[in-house]
Amino acid sequence: MNHKDWDLVNRRLVAKMLSELEYEQVFHAESQGDDRYCINLPGAQWRFIAERGIWGWLWIDAQTLRCADEPVLAQTLLMQLKQVLSMSDATVAEHMQDLYATLLGDLQLLKARRGLSASDLINLNADRLQCLLSGHPKFVFNKGRRGWGKEALERYAPEYANTFRLHWLAVKREHMIWRCDNEMDIHQLLTAAMDPQEFARFSQVWQENGLDHNWLPLPVHPWQWQEKIATDFIADFGEGRMVSLGEFGDQWLAQQSLRTLTNASRRGGLDIKLPLTIYNTSCYRGIPGRYIAAGPLASRWLQQVFATDATLVQSGAVILGEPAAGYVSHEGYAALARAPYRYQEMLGVIWRENPCRWLKPDESPFLMATLMEWDENNQPLAGAYIDRSGLDAETWLTQLFRVVVVPLYHLLCRYGVALIAHGQNITLAMKEGVPQRVLLKDFQGDMRLVKEEFPEMDSLPQEVRDVTSRLSADYLIHDLQTGHFVTVLRFISPLMVRLGVPERRFYQLLAAVLSDYMKKHPQMSERFALFSLFRPQIIRVVLNPVKLTWPDLDGGSRMLPNYLEDLQNPLWLVTQEYES
């Protein structure tokens, strides 16, 4: 570490803290003219240069930050927020731990990305590139990983890009909630995680332990095995409900979400999502049992919809299937109805198709979160894709909106299904720098249904309906507006200004794509009115002030955001300007 890097990661984090908390209306930045602003906090004044964008959000130039003659440190700002947010010393200390871990992760990212231009970065393979992304754009401390020390971070955090093997258990079938798609069997799952030599070794150990079809194999993250399962589930081992088999199989690489792992030994098979009892961003990263049995049914139903609906077929959009899932309840903790949720989410698995299974030979995948990034020379990665495509920026953006937003909006309006499409849930299939189609994932808890009964939803299995949240249309639309427009496009549109596309023009292009889609489907006019994207105001979701003051961070209950209904809608704004 050197002082220059330490100063840079602190400045970037302070800029993020000030801009997000100002957006969430914790305080207000006063304009001093000429793009100069100041924010007054108890005993301190922060000054900086920034541009206030169409969302009312400040894009702060981190190099211009000043707080009297003090060094620009994220810790200093957190201490100043203590009085503003009425935080206790204990709460500040907990978040200071997350702050330090985030700075450590950011330093590693700085090191790993050093010397790589935007063009260099997009030339990396998708697995390597996703390791170099910045993380959740809205939570200010997005790499807390509370529970991991330096050794665990270096071994399992994506920015270090290290690979590891999985620990395997055998679980008695009656002791496990298990659902496997009809088109997948356990042998296929195992061979997706082990080459023939390792599978033979695994089979030998399986037989040596006297195991048969009454047992199910279950992979476990090696950290979770060492820190939680080997101790907390000792009764299951002692009473013969589970058997530890050891480490087997391929090497795995952590994705940005930490829990989801990609096969680094043999690309293109199945990804595996495993619980980790660590606190990151807003909750403990376990896997709840509530959705396990319904997950494969939900993804199969969505795949059928996307294969038969003419608009979705034309879009080329793909659902990444979840062919199998399992969950093991802890007998002791399950008897404690009011125990913190983290004790109920310690052991399980979700198998998911890797995007490579759906790519054509001339396509390559990348996460949409990549478009929020820029290189060390402040060049947006989006610009490198546009340069490669040979298209102008407006044509490229129009294509992006067609392949991403139209399928999401059509799914919502026709079927009453909303997917929380943040930057890590959206994979784009690219051909020579041009977005071709979208690949969508994560339906266990991140899929919601409209409260009204739509006939197009009749074929959805009842088992899925029983565990899926249902919301009125005016709240369900927020999954697209907040989940995608605010959480993804809000961070892309300011970068496009550097590429010659003003923010208002950015959202005019989006409005034009949506208007064109709606004109082609006049029979759905009532649904478009029900799920209107052009109302003057939308919900402002407030995350950071809630997280920084949430009293139950030990996992007693999940953090719930606050909602304000005062956010001016850019789509309405640019439409009004266009019409006038």
From Swiss-Prot:
Enzyme Commission code(s) on record: 6.3.2.39
Protein name in UniProt: Aerobactin synthase
Its biological purpose: Catalyzes the attachment of the second N-acetyl-N-hydroxylysine to the carboxylic group of N-citryl-N-acetyl-N-hydroxylysine to yield aerobactin. Involved in the biosynthesis of the siderophore aerobactin which is a chelator that mediates the high-affinity iron transport systems induced under iron-stressed conditions.
Pathway: Siderophore biosynthesis; aerobactin biosynthesis
Signal sequence coordinates: none
Superkingdom: Bacteria
GO molecular function annotations of the record: aerobactin synthase activity; ATP binding; transferase activity
Catalysis: reaction(s): N(2)-citryl-N(6)-acetyl-N(6)-hydroxy-L-lysine + N(6)-acetyl-N(6)-hydroxy-L-lysine + ATP = aerobactin + AMP + diphosphate + H(+)
Gene disruption: observed consequences: Cells lacking this gene are not able to produce aerobactin and accumulate N-citryl-N-acetyl-N-hydroxylysine.
Organism: Escherichia coli
Alphabetical list of InterPro entries matching this protein: Aerobactin_biosyn_IucA/IucC_N, IucA/IucC-like_C, LucA/IucC-like
Keywords tagged on the record: ATP-binding, Ligase, Nucleotide-binding, Plasmid, Transferase
Family membership noted in the UniProt record: Belongs to the IucA/IucC family.
GO biological process: aerobactin biosynthetic process; siderophore biosynthetic process
